[in-house]
Amino acid sequence: MTRGGPGGRPGLPQPPPLLLLLLLLPLLLVTAEPPKPAGVYYATAYWMPAEKTVQVKNVMDKNGDAYGFYNNSVKTTGWGILEIRAGYGSQTLSNEIIMFVAGFLEGYLTAPHMNDHYTNLYPQLITKPSIMDKVQDFMEKQDKWTRKNIKEYKTDSFWRHTGYVMAQIDGLYVGAKKRAILEGTKPMTLFQIQFLNSVGDLLDLIPSLSPTKNGSLKVFKRWDMGHCSALIKVLPGFENILFAHSSWYTYAAMLRIYKHWDFNVIDKDTSSSRLSFSSYPGFLESLDDFYILSSGLILLQTTNSVFNKTLLKQVIPETLLSWQRVRVANMMADSGKRWADIFSKYNSGTYNNQYMVLDLKKVKLNHSLDKGTLYIVEQIPTYVEYSEQTDVLRKGYWPSYNVPFHEKIYNWSGYPLLVQKLGLDYSYDLAPRAKIFRRDQGKVTDTASMKYIMRYNNYKKDPYSRGDPCNTICCREDLNSPNPSPGGCYDTKVADIYLASQYTSYAISGPTVQGGLPVFRWDRFNKTLHQGMPEVYNFDFITMKPILKLDIK
């Protein structure tokens, strides 16, 4: 496992001499070519049909089966940037092989960071070694069940698309293994890669597998269940529609990659094979969630806690995990309703969230928001509820802040009891962020003001925060004076209808410093593993935009 970095501090692994040589070779041969920026790795994967293996070269070749780059800029901007195009090469491949080589290339390009991310997150999730056996057993059964259904129902479009996603994760594993072998490091196991992809699901799976001593209500820290803030804002004359998302979780998860994928999957039931989204090393999903899809759909998500432990006992392995269902729905759906229908199948009851599916095809600027513009989808174990909520959006905004919207979901999850015991902070209408969004959303008129509200934290002066650095849009639990811990809001992504048409967004990594809040430094929390991360987070918003064109040489 790589732990490089000057002064013994966790840092990014240095590129191996061979890889560096291959990266520099084109510069030595073609002197007219401008030098590549430091830390940008190019690679192309070639499927070898006879051997059923993948060959990889450290060049960008548009005739290859998957090609792309990884810009390892985590230390300078807080983000790595990955862009991959697959299935556009000189040979015709099946959709499964296209997905496999796309996964392979991602694994090959990002393996060192995948290792770091696993190292950082494992101790956050597995606090007792005894739970790991139960998790592994559950996940092995779930994987076996999934693959059995993919084989059995080849003509079913849902299972066919599930097969594409599983081919991609298999490729990710093989590609990461290839890179590890080249560098002489220990390869990650397939289970470790599945564990990474299931981080969101594990937030509910682990409590469901843990024995509860009594019926006591466990109230989690504000960030440890992956809580987030999201906002969709429509301007008064429908001149523009803006959307944004700020992730909350442990700061141990701050190793970030923004991804642009373009996979040439030809299937009558595929609606989106090109997408841009915020993500993490080794994740084939966003987790946040923040997706811009070629179907014209935007997907945002915030997490709902399930305080009803009886519900969590309903979780079984013969289901599809949330990350898998999100990926299948993203690929297949061309409308909010269709997304909700697909996502509802084989509900695992893990990573129980509120999803906002915004259909930009239904938005007629300066004219109307047609029916179907916004669907809200919420999941708990054994039940998914969704509804068309464009009417609310027409009034100006849709906020999301970790309290369920649908009454049944709210009641079954145990929120009424929480309100009874702990007060209105847990209610849908009077949660602190509900009040702040209601008060301030009218000030959002463009991407700059959207950035401002989504990084907002004025906990010392805002009456709705009552002195608590997490009773606000962008939480800083590390500033909680009685009991600081390294968790909270650590990113923001912002876009509008115009940017989305170019798969573009503005993104910032790290805890908010708005209003003069102190910059986050790891030296205050050195016991928390943060391998591969910058020591200090003080970055600006950067523009995320895919740059690979068909005409690359």
UniProtKB/Swiss-Prot annotation:
Its main location: other. Residues 1-38 form the signal peptide. This is Phospholipase B-like 1. It comes from Homo sapiens. Disulfide bonds join C470-C475, C474-C489. GO terms for biological process: phospholipid catabolic process. The lineage of its organism: Eukaryota, Metazoa, Chordata, Craniata, Vertebrata. The gene is PLBD1. In view of the small size of the putative binding pocket, it has been proposed that it may act as an amidase or a peptidase. Exhibits a weak phospholipase activity, acting on various phospholipids, including phosphatidylcholine, phosphatidylinositol, phosphatidylethanolamine and lysophospholipids. Glycans are attached at N71, N308, N366, N411, N526. Its EC number is 3.1.1.-.
